Amino acid sequence: MVPKLFQSSRFKAFKKSETSELQKGLVSQYAYERIDAVKRTIAAMTVGKDVSSLFPDVLKNLATRDITLKKLVYLYLINYAKTHPDLCILAVNTFVKDSEEYNPTLRALAIRTMGCIRVNKIIGYLADPLRKALKDEHPYVRKAAAVCVVKMYDLDREYCASNGFIEQLQALVSDPNPVVVANAVRSLAEIHDQDPEKGYFNVVYTMTDRLMVALSECNEWGRITILNSLARFRTSDIKEAEYVCERVVPQFQHANSGVVLSAVKVIMVHIPLFSSDFTDFLYKKMAPPLLTLLSTDSEIQYVALRNINLILQKRPSIFDVKTRVFFCKYNDPLYIKMEKLKIITMLACDENINETISELRAYVSEVELEFVKQTIKCLGDVALKVPSVINDCISIFLEIYELNISYMVQEVTVVMETVLRKYPQKIDLLLPYLSRVIEELGDPRARSSMAWILGEFSHVIPTSSKLLSEMISTMADEDLQIQLALLTAVVKLSLMNGKGNDEELVQKVLNYAINQSSNQDLRDRAFAYQRLLTPENVRKAQKIVCCEKPSVSYNNNLPEALLDALLCEITTLASVYHKLPESFIGQGKFGADAIQRRAVEELNIEEANVHEAIEKGANVENLLDLDFTDPGATSASDSPITSAQPQSGSNSAMDLFMAFEAPSTNNAEPVKARSATDDLLGL
């Protein structure tokens, strides 16, 4: 739906006839007409219409004493600064003049607009006004100047560093105004990320006092910036780290979720240094704010749940195990439900297992297919994690088999493979359902799991040979995953039972895998089994294939090193993806300006290639002006050559033309040498 702001007549389609009308309004002698024309121009610009043709007329209104009009013109200039920087450079004298105005708003606007012009020419004009703005008496100007230093550094790093702008920016960290401090910290952090080896922003203990003072006085954006800078603070002194964390703890009560998670980040970075008592105190303070985030919008809930997942892996006892806040609500989006199921599984223990099983049993009857599948998987994980409820979980699985709903039956079969690896004695409960279940299996994962069950427990399942034979009859049409499982299953069947029919089944599968299959993995495994199944190796094969399998356990945690790295990336995409930043953003961070510069470079390269092609074309057109009287081109007729092979004495232009000449149809008969002019006319 289009917002009401854009439904007014001002935002209707921008017609060509309106251009002349706006031009007249922009140069009107009446101020109210000029203001109205600028507003209409910006309205058209806001909805994506190209009004850059009005740039000269809009620029004329820059030299005005009307603050409202000047702000509108600056807004127009900032919008076109990235796409039309060469036009904006025309107004640089006005920018420099405005940077010395008595009004701090105008001074800040001038500095901000000059920083938005992304051409190297602007640096010479920007340097002196920016140097003055960094020491301006008004904090609003200093705040804008701090951000402008980053933009200058992005344009020319050497110039910015050699002219003392970095040192002036570092001095702003001690500014009495908290907003200026926040902007200075953010700018230094961004500069440091571009050149970490130069160490422009290293947070030390002497800096933390000023940051703490600013932390309690600035808005939420400033707090997030300062908290992220405190997360950069590294120390081996426990007292210093405790002081920082104690000052950060009150930020847990902030209403903004970004501030809360940034405070959590600071705590998690420093918490390995502390004693168990202080660690317990910090986790106790951290838990309620994290749970409060689950009552916010769904998008914030998702980010909170992904970060809670990481914290739970580090500290499983942070929450009360009987809390119901992680139970799924009927109106939760699917992505929230999926994350909550993971948390429920992580919190499952003997104290809350009955309530957890009852809740998961209720989820099985939901209508969302993916949610039900994930619930069944969670039931299997709970069975592995809490052995006391294995009978309850298998009872739920058998109830699902009774329902005979295809996708549920298939997911249960996949889970049962894992459950039976730890509880093989429970296979007896599954026996009455195997013949009926196998007909419902279409998912490759489920069919391969069923093949594993039939092979692993072939000595217990009376119909294992028959069921495997039915699956093998369609082996050629199965996925590789199923073919590998069937191959292993029939080998187990043969080694455990040793019946004649089973031997025939094994030979049938081996023959297909070795002689008919084109997959190298399947053939290699078949060759290995074929050598193992020779009479002299039967006992060795039984020890290898039918050996006792190691018990499985529930472990869904990330590697310790990866977990510690991700806990230091809370409030970033890395903590949501559960991946290190370099795995999805590359080795460097690229902003919109860097991408735009790269696009311009590619356009310049393409344009240079076009010019080069045009120049080559011009040379070809001037071929008739060349001197073709080269002796090699008129060689004696007794020196036969083929028409497809240029003469050694011809020049490069003639080589080009003769390369396009059709080859001779009679290679046995030598072709007389022709002059270069004949070759040219022969085209």
UniProtKB/Swiss-Prot annotation:
Keywords noted in UniProt: Cell membrane, Coated pit, Membrane, Phosphoprotein, Protein transport, Transport
Residue list for modification Phosphoserine: S675
Region Disordered, annotated ranges: 629-649
Biological process per Gene Ontology, one example term: retrograde transport, endosome to Golgi
Domain of life the protein comes from: Eukaryota
Topology within the bilayer: Peripheral membrane protein
InterPro entries, per the entry: AP_beta, AP_complex_bsu_1_2_4, ARM-like, ARM-type_fold, Clathrin/coatomer_adapt-like_N
Main location: membrane
Subcellular location: Cell membrane; Membrane, Coated pit
Compositional bias of kind Polar residues: 632-649
GO terms for MF: clathrin binding
Family under the similarity heading: Belongs to the adaptor complexes large subunit family.
Subunit annotation: Adaptor protein complex 1 (AP-1) is a heterotetramer composed of two large adaptins (gamma-type subunit apl4 and beta-type subunit apl2), a medium adaptin (mu-type subunit apm1) and a small adaptin (sigma-type subunit aps1). AP-1 interacts with clathrin.
Protein name: AP-1 complex subunit beta-1
Species of provenance: Schizosaccharomyces pombe (strain 972 / ATCC 24843)
Source species taxonomy: Eukaryota, Fungi, Dikarya, Ascomycota, Taphrinomycotina
Gene assigned in the entry: apl2
